[in-house]
Every structure is written in structure tokens, then in C-alpha cells.
């Protein structure tokens, strides 16, 4: 009898928690009863595996489904859409409830869109080529390299404030342009968040090398990634609560360990 009563109490608690999560999101999503999540076109490893977020494979895809579950949405109630990075950070109405594309939370962006609390704090890493393998992994050693980067990302302020290159860095439109500039010997190195740097070094550069990393707690302006939402979105409180619960339970750390485990093997820049 006691066991039956206890099981009933647990079931009631779980039902109450699920109902509360669903109540939080009720009437606040673009499509009632469904959560619309945007990602890039394409979406890249290790954030999304094989450009197929609906599989739940890859760090951001897995986090999206975990957050959705915490908010009371079944996997079949998660709808994926695509949106460009640059358009997403502009003010105005959105065709998604949340968007995950490694959006760094910055005061400037936060004036025109809303962000969730961070779901990942990213170390910044130096991407270069094997020809620069002997470059000292120190700020002083990196200063003399020819640097490039994507103008609209937070990597540029980190580069200028943490490394302060001897020459002005060259600016490009996106990650692909930076990689092509490196292949053409226009630049020697660029800063990316660590998982992206690892992917680019392994997949897009034949002789790519991640020389070192600045831990998130040491680099000025290091990236904290948040889910992006339309400014004033009432869903924000629900999303924040879900991420907080996943953080407290250790689930976020488990997802990070599963999909971003390579990040621990990169030397720290002194």
C-alpha cells in the first residue's frame, strides 16, 4: 500500500511538472502546441550532424530537443525551419520561436532581439595551418600573424582585445570566406569558437590546425551562446526555466560531453 501510494505521488508530481511546463508555453508559440526551432542553412557539425537537426544529433540539435522536452513538447511537436544568421539578428518579426546558430549574447544584439540564458560558454580558438605549427601558443607569439575573421561575429573584438595583432585583420563575410582566404595565403590565422575551429581544421582545410584555445573565463568578451527570440517574446521565461533545469540536473553537461568532447584536448594559450 505504501509503495502504491509513493508511486502515485511520484506520477502525480511528474504530471504536475509536465502540465506546468506546457502551461508556461501555452499560447506563446507561433503554432499552438508546437515549438518552431530555426537553425542555419546549412547547419554544421558538431552543432548539427549531417545538416539534419530533426535527428537530434549534434550539440545544438540535442539541446533543442532537451529544452523542448523540459517545456512539455514531444519530439514530434518540434518543427524545424531555416534562417540566415544575419537576418536573424535584425529587429522585427520572426518565423520561429527560438533560433540556435551559435548566437553570442551581446548588449548590442540584445537591444533588438531577446536571448535565453546561455546554454553554452565557448572558448575561443586559433585556427591556422600546419605550416604555422611551430608558432608559440602565446599572445606574443600570435600577435605577428596575418589575421582574418568574419566582421559580424564576436571573434573580432576578442581578437583585438586579447591578441591585439600587429597589423589590422582582414574582414570577410562568413566562415567559408575566411577558410578560402587561408587557403589562398591571404591570412595566417583566424579566431573561432572552439568546436567550429575543430570542425574547420578537420573537414575544410587539408592542413588545418587548431593551435590553441583561450578558455571562456580568460578571454575578454568570450562567447556565451543563447537561443535567439523575437524581442519581447513571452516564451523567454519558459525557455530560461527549461535551460536552468537542464543545467541543474547535469543534462546540459552530458550533452556537451557527448558532442563536444574534442574540445578538452586543445592546448591553452598562455
Predicted regions and their residues:
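Extracytoplasmic small-molecule ligand-binding "clamshell" domains
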Residues: 23-102
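Bilobed "Venus flytrap"/periplasmic-binding protein-like clamshell domains
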Residues: 42-43, 54-70, 104, 125-177, ...
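Extended ligand-binding regions for polar small-molecule ligands
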Residues: 61-71, 132, 145-146, 153, ...
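Periplasmic-binding protein-like
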Residues: 41, 121-128, 194, 202-243, ...
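Alpha-to-beta junction loops
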Residues: 73-75, 93-101, 145, 184-192, ...
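Ligand-binding clefts/hinges and TM-proximal coupling segments of bilobed small-molecule sensing domains
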Residues: 154-170, 209-210, 241-270
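Acidic, polar ligand-binding/catalytic clefts
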Residues: 77-141, 216
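A ligand-binding cleft/hinge motif common to bilobed small-molecule-binding domains
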Residues: 86-87, 103-112, 158-161, 188-221
Amino acid at each position: 500500500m505504501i509503495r502504491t501510494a509513493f508511486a502515485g505521488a511520484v506520477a502525480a508530481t511528474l504530471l504536475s511538472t509536465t502540465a506546468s511546463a506546457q502551461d508556461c508555453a501555452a499560447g506563446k508559440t507561433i503554432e499552438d502546441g508546437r515549438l518552431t526551432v530555426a537553425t542555419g542553412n546549412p547547419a554544421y557539425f558538431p552543432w548539427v550532424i549531417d545538416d539534419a537537426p530533426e535527428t537530434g544529433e549534434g550539440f545544438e540539435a540535442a539541446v533543442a530537443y532537451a529544452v523542448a522536452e523540459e517545456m512539455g513538447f514531444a519530439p514530434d511537436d518540434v518543427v524545424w525551419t531555416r534562417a540566415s544568421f544575419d537576418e536573424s539578428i535584425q529587429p522585427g518579426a520572426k518565423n520561429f520561436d527560438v533560433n540556435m546558430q551559435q548566437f553570442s549574447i551581446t548588449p548590442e544584439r540584445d537591444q533588438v532581439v531577446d536571448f535565453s540564458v546561455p546554454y553554452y560558454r565557448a572558448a575561443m580558438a586559433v585556427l591556422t595551418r600546419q605550416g604555422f605549427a611551430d608558432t608559440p601558443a602565446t599572445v606574443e607569439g600570435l600577435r605577428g600573424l596575418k589575421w582574418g575573421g568574419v566582421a559580424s561575429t564576436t571573434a573580432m573584438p576578442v581578437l583585438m582585445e586579447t591578441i591585439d595583432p600587429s597589423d589590422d585583420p582582414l574582414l570577410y563575410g562568413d566562415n567559408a570566406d575566411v577558410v578560402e582566404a587561408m587557403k589562398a595565403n591571404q591570412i595566417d590565422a583566424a579566431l573561432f569558437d572552439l568546436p567550429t575551429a575543430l570542425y574547420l581544421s578537420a573537414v575544410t582545410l587539408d592542413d588545418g590546425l587548431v593551435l590553441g584555445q583561450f578558455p571562456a573565463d580568460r578571454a575578454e568578451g568570450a562567447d556565451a551562446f543563447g537561443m535567439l527570440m523575437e524581442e519581447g517574446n513571452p516564451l523567454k521565461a519558459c525557455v530560461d526555466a527549461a535551460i536552468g533545469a537542464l543545467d541543474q540536473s547535469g543534462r546540459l553537461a552530458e550533452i556537451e560531453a557527448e558532442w563536444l568532447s574534442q574540445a578538452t584536448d586543445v592546448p591553452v594559450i598562455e
